[in-house]
Amino acid sequence: MRKYEIMCLISPELSEEDFKTLYEGIQQDIQNLGGEVQNVDVWGKRTLAYPVKKFTEGYYVVMNFLFPQTQLPEFERRLKLREKLLRYMITLLEKEE
């Protein structure tokens, strides 16, 4: 398995509870697809440098996780189905040893 980091930008329209439910759902997707979440860093609501989908604010969450490379396309497909997830970026941190 490889080590990845995902940074998520989530709609500011959500309540704190709905925001928590959304990022916990992303964690659940990682685990259901054979991955392991190692660290979750919730940055909270931040002002954006430029509007994204007409929003000037958004919630940020950064997660580090181990994940099988073969499951990455399915994970990205599931992320795209989440309407309140405005943007995400997945970065490979370390290759397999």
Curated annotation (Swiss-Prot):
Superkingdom of the organism of origin: Bacteria
One BP annotation, GO: translation
InterPro entries: Ribosomal_bS6, Ribosomal_bS6_sf, Ribosomal_S6_plastid/chlpt, Transl_elong_EF1B/ribsomal_bS6
Classification via CDD domains: bS6 (cd00473)
A GO molecular-function annotation: small ribosomal subunit rRNA binding
GO (cellular component) term, any one: ribonucleoprotein complex
Pfam family, one: Ribosomal_S6
Swiss-Prot/TrEMBL keywords: Ribonucleoprotein, Ribosomal protein, RNA-binding, rRNA-binding
Purpose: Binds together with bS18 to 16S ribosomal RNA.
Family the UniProt entry places it in: Belongs to the bacterial ribosomal protein bS6 family.
Designated name of the protein: Small ribosomal subunit protein bS6
Record gene name: rpsF
